[in-house]
Amino acid sequence: MEKETTFLGLKLSEKGPGNDMVKKALGYSLKYLEIETFMDVIGFVKDPVMTDYFWHIMVDNHCRHLATVLLECLGYEGTYNKQQYAIKRFLKSNRINYSELSSDDPQIDLYPTIKEEMKNMKPNAIACRKWLIIEPREFKKVIMKLNTKNGDNIREYYIRLEELIKLYLEYSLYFKEREAQIEKQKSQFHIETLEKKLDEMKLEAEKRHDELLDKVEEVQYDLNVVGEKLDIAVEDRAPKVKAELLRERFVVLNRNDKRASCQYYVMRGQDHYINGKIFSYKNLHPNLKIIFDISCQPNPRNLFVRFKELKDNRFKVVGNNIQTLDEKALLEVFNKLNDDKRNIQLM
């Protein structure tokens, strides 16, 4: 079932906006669009006068100056005096509050349109002039009650601006939701990248450990050539260790992990050591499988040394790792090498 969130009468869907204009704005840029750009993107037709005046009336609480150009837009034509007479009569008859500012009022500086009108006036005219000021709420009453020839067009445009604000709010909410999802995905990607890097570091450390162990064992093998001849004796010549934890094991593991460069891994050591290593390896490779396990091998190191001496092209040995595409052949070789311990060739 689709989840919806309601905010100030707007229903926000998990599937995204249903309004084509909001979709267009969201698809225009990953950056947040200011209202002017939003209007351009969705193709909103702006009136050079009404857009600016009406927008400020809707979004802020600052009083507005009923400038000459605004009065003309509202439908009050003729000379300045005629305009003033008509608008004042309209305001009084409809009980709409307004105020007047004279040239010596310090609040004059708050209205750039008044300062602009004063530039084209003579000093004596400025001294006698009164400028009409109206609060946003009262100006909305003007729009609703306007009875000039432009009244219907003014109200229609005001309604369109209200619809624009609703669209912009919807766009803003979906934009913030998209930003939150992007940040969430970035965080998840960052976490996954770190986890992947950590796994790679573990695999690399494992590889280096194996290579080092391999070198140590090769040196040890060179020092114990004679001992090897004795270690390959049959089990009745090399009795089993009674304590199970101290018994030697030779184990071949299949990692079953696509991340690993080598799928097969050899472990040699006492039983308790092997069990501990397998437990930790399963945490690193959840699909780990034991494919070859010899318990009580008299000297498991020698078995792997003999395997490497075969130099079989089907197998590539890197440390304790084995690369091969033929697991069956690998098992056959180890079984044969294990059986060969019965063939004693003492010098």
UniProtKB/Swiss-Prot annotation:
Record has Coiled coil as a keyword: yes
InterPro entries registered for this protein in UniProt: DUF3627, MSV199_dom
Signal as UniProt keyword: no
Segments forming a coiled coil: 178-226
Pfam families with a match to the protein in the record: DUF3627, MSV199
Sorted UniProt keywords: Coiled coil
Family to which this protein belongs: Belongs to the IIV-6 006L/238R/313L/468L family.
Protein name: Putative MSV199 domain-containing protein 388R
Species the sequence originates in: Invertebrate iridescent virus 6 (IIV-6)
